[in-house]
Amino acid sequence: MERKELSYTIQSWSSYSGAFHPINILIDNPHQANSRWSCNTSICKPNNSEEQYVILKLDKLALVTDITFGKFHTPHLCNLKDFIVYGGREQHLMFPLLRAGLTNDSNRETFPLCIKKYNKIENSIACKYIKIVPLQAHAHEFNMSIWYVALHGIDSASALSCTEKNRALHLEKKALNCLLSYFAFKGKLDICSVILQSYQLSIPHSPLMRMYDAFCRLGDTQKTILLFQQELQAEIIEKWPKHKLTKLRSHRIATFLKGISRRSGHQMVYNPKDNCIYLYGGWDGVKTFSDFWIYNVDKDLWIMENEYGIPGERVCHRMVIDTSQQKLYLLGNYFGSSRETEVPPDARTDFWEFDISKKVWTCLSYDTSKDGGPAAIFDHGMSVDEKRGIVYVSGGCKWDPDELVFEGLYAYDTKNRIWEQLAVRYEDRQKHCEFKIERMGHCMEYFPDENKLYIFGGQSYDQEFILDMCYIKLETREAVQHVRKNDTSQSPSPSFCQRSIMDSKNHRIFTMFGFEQRNIHKVLRPSLWIFYITTEEWVKISDINEEEGNEHPCSRFGHAVAADLNRNIIYLMGGNASTHPLRPMKLSDFWKLDILDRWGIKHCLSNVSLQLHLHRFHELVSENLAKAVEYLQKSMQPQFDKSPLFWNALILDAFSGTHKNKDIAQRRFETFQTIYDLLPVDENTVAPNESLLNMIEFFT
């Protein structure tokens, strides 16, 4: 099945301004300022709720796989920072296929159009109409503009026939599930059996169905609790999505009253062989440090290895560890403002190696630019392939008195002591996705299982923060750009000086953001995310202490992180808690962040159990108040870790008598619905509910 460019016409639009008619997006003319569609200025004000859109009608029904946006030949503030794309067979029935934003540059950008409607895997759907809804330009006071749109996909009869068949099967299955769920809710299990036999489906005697039968139909709460403990718990653990498991819990280890002072721009790595953390350099706002510290985790003790020796003062450098060879590699330095009229005489990139066993620093190069490596750089990316003995360096700002200049991608062979600059090409299908390795303040992580480099985030030439990500297949030097999923709220904001950790065992990257760009503003706002390599999705995680209002790390950037992934611990130290260049707020706090991979399951099981016991408590309140209080004290308080306020509120509620007149059957069903909402069910789960009635009411 051949993918090709799909022809279309302009079907309708919300508005347009002056000569900027929607028909202009049919022609790619990046050097013509008028060759674009712009919505009417008076209509597209932020406080106006009227939706702006343009609808494209394809010449033929087709599986639309992706959409390409052309741009003006220079960055333009009218480019779309946020937009949604819908698609479908009919104008009145279209589904969201993409939510994304364009980078404010001159490069074309291509995005996949897909939907998770017919199965768990994202697929393209057959469309006759495509609707583009602009939401925001790169500047609020400017019109929202689209310069050019190209659609690509497959319109062969065989492909459409196969898609239609899958669509019909999926809709039929959903219809059956709705019927089964409704009749189970009404207690008509004989009708459920007839439907299942007619379609040759197995009868769903799942723990959830048995629990519903015991709880809602028979009213046996004690039996329901036993069913939950003996059967449903195991099913929850098996079905729970891995990406919904993880939380962090922070613990402050120490504040440095002596020794290590406040700083940012320092580097920190963890060595599993000796269970120690190695920290080098940094800046306190006035002084640049050359101190080298070792933290012994077992002894909870910091030891200064050297204070004024080699490799010397530095900040915004990078340091990585090769645990197999027990070597540290250190590169880069920030010498002052990149706008100085002259390059400082010591602005060279010296490259150092530290032998952990011998505790000796060795200079591998006094000027890497003369040895085939990068020029004097800072805020670059650095990672190591321990198996092959290669250190990779990407981006970073070079010293230039006139403009920001960024480096490319380099590899250093630690065995042969040789630098090599790597040329990267892009996959044919992504030839218009020109990911720029040349950036600063970004992250780069090496993924050993697939011999790939992941590069994301940082700052571009125009000093805008970026989030785009690509991975580089090192065997072929081929780059593939990762495209954010349909909802931009499901990915981090563009950021600078974020910190990342590769967890290769679990195929994920932990990233700690702090200095983010929200719309046109750059703000300090903490956020923790995991990028799952297998599913190519970002998932936001949280610090439990922050959720509970307890002590936790504040917003920061330029901090240092290191991870002991064998014990599921991330260490965090220092950073800058202010974005004001003249009023920096350097930090000296030291934190341990425990990675709780099973927190989601435990939280779910605890909440389900609590709901059942609360229902039993309210049943006893209606029958015998003394027994209810005894049940709370002996069966609930020892099992659930709740505050005195929680238990006091239950007692007061019991004595108020508000539950005595409530219909017991209705209360059981409400409790079951609360439990159902907590469970990791999917669209194939048959669970008793009355959603069928709601659907009929909605469509009639």
Swiss-Prot record:
Cellular component terms per the entry's GO annotation: cytoplasm
Gene3D superfamilies: Galactose-binding domain-like, Kelch-type beta propeller
Keyword entries, A-Z: Kelch repeat, Repeat
Kelch repeats: 276-322, 327-381, 390-439, 452-499, 508-558, 569-619
Keyword ATP-binding among record annotations: no
PANTHER family documented for this protein: MUSKELIN (PTHR15526:SF5)
Remaining remarks: Transcription is induced by mei4 transcription factor.
The name this protein goes by in its record: Mei4-dependent protein 6
Species name: Schizosaccharomyces pombe (strain 972 / ATCC 24843)
Phylogenetic classification of the source organism: Eukaryota, Fungi, Dikarya, Ascomycota, Taphrinomycotina
